[in-house]
Every structure is written in structure tokens, then in C-alpha cells.
């Protein structure tokens, strides 16, 4: 049976070791959240009960949890069943590629917590396997592979600062397929059906943020039609996210290198999505400047 309790925000921050949980906790604390670091999974339910207690003066509580320490998924499921109409309970999952995690562990010269007598990659693989269920149940997944601590803190600030009544925070992210598809994307669109400005000498050094490139890309046959049709298709999706209390969405727009077509289309799509009710939009260009 669900228990009716006040609407405090409760954020559970978890994910891969080395993916940036402590950085996220610090960033949330800077935004005014009350942050509990290294909370044992068994303490989650008492924390949520505290958030719902009458007179609680902590409107935003974040718990940084290491899910390796217990049966976290069953604990979370029990919380959702008990407090189904209670706090705005969200799960933020941080992940990174094996290469990024190996690099970070080698920089600090520490073994992975699950490494045992095996290799560093063995420990990462074991942890990733344990994380499958909780990743799938998370409200927001952030891939930190290409982010330093300052960029990750900025990402958290963009996602969790500002008006609390924004129904869905949408990140429109351009990227280059040659650098890999964003692991944290909810939806991916491929702009390689459009002619590449790279092959036009005067446009090659420019980016999709420049008017000449934007006009070129959006002036191609089917470009404007696609962007407007995609925005119309996303409208009921984002409205459904609001009804289901899914408060974050990442829409990835790709081209070959992430410099021209995907950037121009991301900017145009963002401007259209900003007209939707209950939607707060930010635009990121993941691979701009990598060429």
C-alpha cells in the first residue's frame, strides 16, 4: 500500500566506480541539496521516510549510494512500492567506457573494488554486470567518459538548477558517429542523409553554429521537413514523459564528425522544442572541436 507523504525531492546517485559519483554529490551540494555520501543501501528507506516526515526542512535530499554493498535493487523496489505517491524519487546513474574507467583508476593508482586477484578490467566487468538492473530502472543516465570533473559539475548544474516546475529537462546533443554513439541517449537521429558541408571548401572550417553552414544544411531537400516532423513526433513523447514523471531526456543528433550537419540540426530542433509546454531545453555539441 502506498503512503501519502509530502513532495520532497529525493535523488539517488549511483553508477560505476570511477564514473564521478563524488563529483556529482559535491555539485548537488553546491546547488543546495542535502547530500549523504556513501549511504548503505539498507539506509535508503529510512532516508526516504525522513524526507516525507511532516516539518522536514530538507526539500532536496541526495544519497550517493554504492550498490555493490547490498541488494540495492530490491531495496529500491520496496521503496517505490511503499512510497509510490510520496517524494519525487529519482535515480541518477553514472557510467563510463571501460577505457575511461581504466585511465581514471590508473591515474589514482588504486585497484577496482571488485578486482580481487584479477585484472582491473575484470573488476569493471563484474561491476557492470551487477549494475544492469539498476541502470535500466534509472531516470537519468549520464555517460561521463568524455567529461572532466568541471564539465561533469557543469552538466549537473544544467540538469538540476533552475525552476523546479519544469516538467522535462531535455538535452539535445550533437555528436559524430566516428566518435561513438552517446551511451546516455534516449533517442538517436542520423543526419548523414543530408549532403556534407565538409566537401564545400568555404564551409569546411566553419561549424553548424555558423549561419552559412546552418543555411546550407537546413536548405537541403528534406532537412526542414525532417526537423519539424521530428519535433512534432517528440511532442507526445515528452508529454508522456511528464505524465510518467520522467524528468530528463537526451536526444542525440549525429553526423559523421559532429561538426556541421548534426550541430545545425540540433540548434534548430532545440528552438522548436522550446515552444513545447513544460519542457526546458539545453543544447550540447559533444564533439565540436575534436577534429
From Swiss-Prot:
Keyword terms of this UniProt record: ATP-binding, GTP-binding, Nucleotide-binding
GO function term, MF aspect, one: GTP binding
Residues that hold GTP according to the record: 66-69
Binding site for ATP: 15-22
TM spans (from-to): none
Function: Displays ATPase and GTPase activities.
Protein family per UniProt: Belongs to the RapZ-like family.
Name of the protein: Nucleotide-binding protein CMM_1747
Organism: Clavibacter michiganensis subsp. michiganensis (strain NCPPB 382)
Highest classification ranks of the organism: Bacteria, Bacillati, Actinomycetota, Actinomycetes, Micrococcales
Amino acid at each position: 500500500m502506498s503512503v501519502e507523504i509530502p513532495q520532497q525531492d529525493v535523488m539517488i546517485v549511483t553508477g560505476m566506480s570511477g564514473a564521478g559519483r563524488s563529483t556529482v554529490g559535491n555539485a548537488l551540494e553546491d546547488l543546495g541539496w542535502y547530500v549523504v555520501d556513501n549511504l548503505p543501501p539498507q539506509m535508503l528507506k529510512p532516508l526516504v521516510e525522513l524526507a516525507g516526515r511532516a516539518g522536514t526542512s530538507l526539500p532536496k535530499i541526495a544519497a550517493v549510494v554504492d550498490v555493490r554493498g547490498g541488494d540495492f535493487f530490491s531495496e529500491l523496489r520496496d521503496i517505490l512500492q511503499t512510497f509510490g505517491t510520496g517524494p519525487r524519487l529519482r535515480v541518477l546513474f553514472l557510467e563510463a567506457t571501460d577505457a575511461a574507467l581504466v585511465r581514471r583508476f590508473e591515474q589514482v593508482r588504486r585497484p577496482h573494488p571488485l578486482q580481487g586477484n584479477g585484472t582491473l578490467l575484470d573488476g569493471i566487468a563484474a561491476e557492470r554486470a551487477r549494475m544492469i538492473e539498476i541502470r535500466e530502472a534509472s531516470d537519468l543516465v549520464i555517460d561521463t567518459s568524455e567529461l572532466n570533473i568541471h564539465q561533469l559539475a557543469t552538466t549537473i548544474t544544467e540538469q538540476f538548477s533552475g525552476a523546479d516546475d519544469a516538467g522535462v529537462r531535455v538535452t539535445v546533443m550533437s555528436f559524430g558517429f566516428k566518435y561513438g554513439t552517446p551511451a546516455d541517449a534516449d533517442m538517436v537521429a542520423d543526419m548523414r542523409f543530408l549532403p556534407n558541408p565538409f566537401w564545400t571548401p568555404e564551409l569546411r572550417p566553419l561549424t553548424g553554429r555558423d549561419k552559412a553552414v546552418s543555411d546550407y544544411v537546413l536548405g537541403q531537400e528534406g532537412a526542414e521537413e525532417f526537423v519539424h516532423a521530428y519535433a512534432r513526433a517528440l511532442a507526445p513523447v515528452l508529454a508522456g514523459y511528464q505524465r510518467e514523471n520522467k524528468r530528463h531526456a537526451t536526444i542525440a543528433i549525429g553526423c559523421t564528425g559532429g561538426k556541421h550537419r548534426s550541430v545545425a540540426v540540433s540548434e534548430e530542433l532545440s528552438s522548436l522544442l522550446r515552444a513545447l509546454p513544460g519542457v526546458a531545453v539545453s543544447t550540447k555539441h559533444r564533439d565540436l572541436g575534436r577534429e
